[in-house]
Amino acid sequence: MGIGRAGARTLDLGTGTGTIARSLAQRGCDSIGLDRSAPLMEEARRMDREAGVTVRYVEAAAEDTGFPEASFDLVIAGQCWFWFDRPRVASEARRILKPGGHLVIAHFDWIPLPGNVADLTEKLIEKHNPKWKLGGSLGIHPRCLADMALSGFRRLETFSFDLDVSYSHEAWRGRIRASAGVGASLSPEGVIVFDRELQALLAEKFPQEPLAVLHRVFAAIGKAA
Protein backbone atom coordinates (compact mmCIF):
# COMPACT_ATOMS: atom_id res chain seq x y z
CA MET A 1 0.00 0.00 0.00
CA GLY A 2 3.00 2.29 0.26
CA ILE A 3 2.02 3.61 3.68
CA GLY A 4 4.75 5.35 5.66
CA ARG A 5 7.43 5.28 2.99
CA ALA A 6 10.52 7.45 3.22
CA GLY A 7 9.66 11.06 2.50
CA ALA A 8 6.01 10.78 3.54
CA ARG A 9 4.66 13.50 5.83
CA THR A 10 3.14 11.74 8.82
CA LEU A 11 1.20 12.72 11.94
CA ASP A 12 1.03 10.49 15.03
CA LEU A 13 -2.04 11.35 17.13
CA GLY A 14 -1.82 10.84 20.88
CA THR A 15 1.89 10.34 20.44
CA GLY A 16 2.74 10.16 24.16
CA THR A 17 6.44 9.33 24.42
CA GLY A 18 6.71 9.19 20.64
CA THR A 19 7.10 5.48 19.97
CA ILE A 20 5.25 5.52 16.63
CA ALA A 21 6.45 8.96 15.55
CA ARG A 22 10.04 7.94 16.25
CA SER A 23 9.65 4.72 14.27
CA LEU A 24 8.31 6.67 11.30
CA ALA A 25 11.24 9.09 11.51
CA GLN A 26 13.63 6.13 11.49
CA ARG A 27 11.99 5.03 8.23
CA GLY A 28 12.79 8.40 6.68
CA CYS A 29 9.39 10.05 7.10
CA ASP A 30 8.86 13.72 7.88
CA SER A 31 7.36 12.80 11.24
CA ILE A 32 5.22 14.93 13.57
CA GLY A 33 3.81 13.79 16.91
CA LEU A 34 0.77 15.42 18.50
CA ASP A 35 -0.40 15.15 22.10
CA ARG A 36 -2.00 17.24 24.83
CA SER A 37 0.70 16.28 27.35
CA ALA A 38 3.82 18.44 27.21
CA PRO A 39 5.70 16.30 29.80
CA LEU A 40 5.20 13.14 27.74
CA MET A 41 6.46 14.86 24.61
CA GLU A 42 9.49 16.17 26.48
CA GLU A 43 10.31 12.57 27.34
CA ALA A 44 9.76 11.72 23.67
CA ARG A 45 12.35 14.32 22.67
CA ARG A 46 14.86 12.80 25.09
CA MET A 47 14.28 9.35 23.60
CA ASP A 48 14.58 10.79 20.09
CA ARG A 49 17.99 12.21 20.93
CA GLU A 50 19.11 8.81 22.18
CA ALA A 51 17.83 7.21 18.97
CA GLY A 52 19.46 9.86 16.77
CA VAL A 53 16.26 10.96 15.03
CA THR A 54 14.32 14.20 14.76
CA VAL A 55 10.58 14.44 15.30
CA ARG A 56 8.57 17.64 15.58
CA TYR A 57 6.09 17.65 18.47
CA VAL A 58 2.93 19.74 18.68
CA GLU A 59 0.83 20.26 21.81
CA ALA A 60 -2.79 20.15 20.65
CA ALA A 61 -5.96 18.08 20.74
CA ALA A 62 -6.50 15.38 18.14
CA GLU A 63 -9.98 16.80 17.58
CA ASP A 64 -8.55 20.19 16.55
CA THR A 65 -4.97 19.80 15.33
CA GLY A 66 -4.60 23.28 13.86
CA PHE A 67 -2.98 21.99 10.67
CA PRO A 68 -4.10 23.18 7.23
CA GLU A 69 -6.17 20.98 4.95
CA ALA A 70 -4.34 18.33 2.91
CA SER A 71 -1.18 18.47 5.03
CA PHE A 72 -0.32 14.79 5.50
CA ASP A 73 0.18 11.54 3.63
CA LEU A 74 -0.49 9.47 6.75
CA VAL A 75 -2.32 10.05 10.02
CA ILE A 76 -1.94 7.29 12.58
CA ALA A 77 -3.50 6.69 15.99
CA GLY A 78 -1.94 3.91 18.04
CA GLN A 79 -3.40 2.73 21.35
CA CYS A 80 -5.46 5.89 21.77
CA TRP A 81 -8.51 5.90 19.48
CA PHE A 82 -11.12 5.18 22.13
CA TRP A 83 -9.87 8.00 24.37
CA PHE A 84 -10.81 10.53 21.68
CA ASP A 85 -14.09 12.03 20.52
CA ARG A 86 -13.95 9.54 17.69
CA PRO A 87 -16.26 11.14 15.10
CA ARG A 88 -14.52 14.49 15.49
CA VAL A 89 -11.04 12.99 15.20
CA ALA A 90 -11.98 10.93 12.16
CA SER A 91 -13.35 14.06 10.47
CA GLU A 92 -10.26 16.04 11.42
CA ALA A 93 -8.00 13.32 10.04
CA ARG A 94 -9.97 13.36 6.79
CA ARG A 95 -9.56 17.16 6.60
CA ILE A 96 -5.80 17.20 7.08
CA LEU A 97 -5.01 14.22 4.84
CA LYS A 98 -4.00 14.73 1.24
CA PRO A 99 -6.23 13.04 -1.37
CA GLY A 100 -5.15 9.42 -1.42
CA GLY A 101 -3.63 9.65 2.05
CA HIS A 102 -4.37 7.10 4.74
CA LEU A 103 -5.70 6.99 8.27
CA VAL A 104 -4.41 4.04 10.31
CA ILE A 105 -5.97 3.13 13.65
CA ALA A 106 -3.86 0.56 15.48
CA HIS A 107 -4.28 -1.40 18.68
CA PHE A 108 -1.95 -3.69 20.62
CA ASP A 109 -3.85 -5.61 23.29
CA TRP A 110 -3.01 -8.43 25.63
CA ILE A 111 -5.46 -11.31 25.16
CA PRO A 112 -7.01 -12.84 28.30
CA LEU A 113 -7.59 -16.54 27.73
CA PRO A 114 -8.90 -18.61 30.68
CA GLY A 115 -6.16 -19.03 33.25
CA ASN A 116 -3.40 -17.18 31.41
CA VAL A 117 -1.42 -14.34 32.96
CA ALA A 118 -3.51 -11.61 31.31
CA ASP A 119 -6.75 -13.23 32.49
CA LEU A 120 -5.64 -13.52 36.12
CA THR A 121 -4.17 -10.02 36.04
CA GLU A 122 -7.48 -8.61 34.80
CA LYS A 123 -9.34 -10.42 37.56
CA LEU A 124 -7.00 -8.83 40.10
CA ILE A 125 -7.57 -5.37 38.59
CA GLU A 126 -11.34 -5.91 38.82
CA LYS A 127 -10.99 -6.96 42.46
CA HIS A 128 -9.23 -3.70 43.34
CA ASN A 129 -11.12 -1.48 40.89
CA PRO A 130 -14.68 -2.75 40.32
CA LYS A 131 -15.41 0.26 38.09
CA TRP A 132 -12.81 -0.89 35.55
CA LYS A 133 -14.71 -2.32 32.57
CA LEU A 134 -11.99 -2.70 29.94
CA GLY A 135 -11.19 -6.36 30.52
CA GLY A 136 -12.00 -9.31 28.31
CA SER A 137 -10.97 -7.71 25.03
CA LEU A 138 -10.49 -9.94 22.00
CA GLY A 139 -8.29 -7.28 20.43
CA ILE A 140 -10.61 -6.72 17.44
CA HIS A 141 -12.14 -3.25 17.09
CA PRO A 142 -14.86 -3.04 14.39
CA ARG A 143 -16.07 0.36 15.61
CA CYS A 144 -12.99 1.87 13.98
CA LEU A 145 -14.40 0.94 10.58
CA ALA A 146 -17.70 2.68 11.26
CA ASP A 147 -15.86 5.79 12.44
CA MET A 148 -13.86 5.87 9.21
CA ALA A 149 -16.79 5.18 6.90
CA LEU A 150 -18.99 7.84 8.47
CA SER A 151 -16.22 10.41 7.96
CA GLY A 152 -15.84 9.66 4.27
CA PHE A 153 -12.94 7.20 4.20
CA ARG A 154 -13.06 4.51 1.53
CA ARG A 155 -11.33 1.24 0.66
CA LEU A 156 -11.34 0.18 4.28
CA GLU A 157 -9.08 -2.69 5.25
CA THR A 158 -8.10 -4.46 8.46
CA PHE A 159 -5.47 -6.93 9.50
CA SER A 160 -4.51 -8.63 12.73
CA PHE A 161 -1.94 -11.06 14.02
CA ASP A 162 -0.98 -12.59 17.35
CA LEU A 163 2.37 -12.75 19.08
CA ASP A 164 3.81 -13.61 22.46
CA VAL A 165 5.57 -10.72 24.18
CA SER A 166 8.23 -11.51 26.77
CA TYR A 167 8.11 -9.76 30.14
CA SER A 168 10.07 -10.21 33.31
CA HIS A 169 7.88 -10.22 36.41
CA GLU A 170 9.12 -6.72 37.19
CA ALA A 171 8.35 -5.43 33.69
CA TRP A 172 4.82 -6.88 33.69
CA ARG A 173 4.13 -5.36 37.10
CA GLY A 174 5.40 -2.02 35.80
CA ARG A 175 3.14 -2.15 32.77
CA ILE A 176 0.11 -2.96 34.89
CA ARG A 177 0.91 -0.30 37.50
CA ALA A 178 0.95 2.27 34.69
CA SER A 179 -2.35 1.09 33.19
CA ALA A 180 -5.64 2.99 33.30
CA GLY A 181 -7.21 0.50 35.67
CA VAL A 182 -4.45 0.78 38.27
CA GLY A 183 -2.09 3.76 38.22
CA ALA A 184 -4.64 6.14 36.73
CA SER A 185 -7.48 5.02 39.02
CA LEU A 186 -6.23 3.80 42.40
CA SER A 187 -4.73 5.85 45.21
CA PRO A 188 -0.94 5.62 45.67
CA GLU A 189 -1.54 3.33 48.64
CA GLY A 190 -3.96 1.26 46.57
CA VAL A 191 -1.37 0.85 43.83
CA ILE A 192 1.14 -0.47 46.37
CA VAL A 193 -1.33 -3.01 47.74
CA PHE A 194 -2.33 -4.10 44.23
CA ASP A 195 1.29 -4.47 43.15
CA ARG A 196 2.12 -6.68 46.13
CA GLU A 197 -0.78 -8.97 45.29
CA LEU A 198 0.25 -9.11 41.63
CA GLN A 199 3.81 -9.94 42.67
CA ALA A 200 2.53 -12.82 44.81
CA LEU A 201 0.22 -14.05 42.03
CA LEU A 202 3.06 -14.16 39.51
CA ALA A 203 5.34 -15.98 41.93
CA GLU A 204 2.69 -18.60 42.64
CA LYS A 205 1.04 -19.12 39.24
CA PHE A 206 3.75 -18.14 36.76
CA PRO A 207 7.13 -18.61 38.48
CA GLN A 208 9.16 -19.02 35.30
CA GLU A 209 10.64 -15.95 33.66
CA PRO A 210 10.29 -14.43 31.21
CA LEU A 211 6.52 -14.48 30.97
CA ALA A 212 5.10 -15.10 27.49
CA VAL A 213 2.06 -12.80 27.30
CA LEU A 214 -0.25 -13.31 24.33
CA HIS A 215 -1.01 -10.09 22.43
CA ARG A 216 -2.99 -9.21 19.32
CA VAL A 217 -2.06 -6.47 16.86
CA PHE A 218 -5.08 -5.02 15.04
CA ALA A 219 -5.10 -2.23 12.49
CA ALA A 220 -7.82 -0.55 10.45
CA ILE A 221 -6.84 1.44 7.36
CA GLY A 222 -8.92 3.95 5.43
CA LYS A 223 -8.11 5.97 2.33
CA ALA A 224 -9.02 9.62 1.91
CA ALA A 225 -10.84 10.20 -1.38
Which ranges hold each PLM region?
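Conserved alpha-helix/loop element of class I SAM-dependent methyltransferases that forms part
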Residues: 1-8
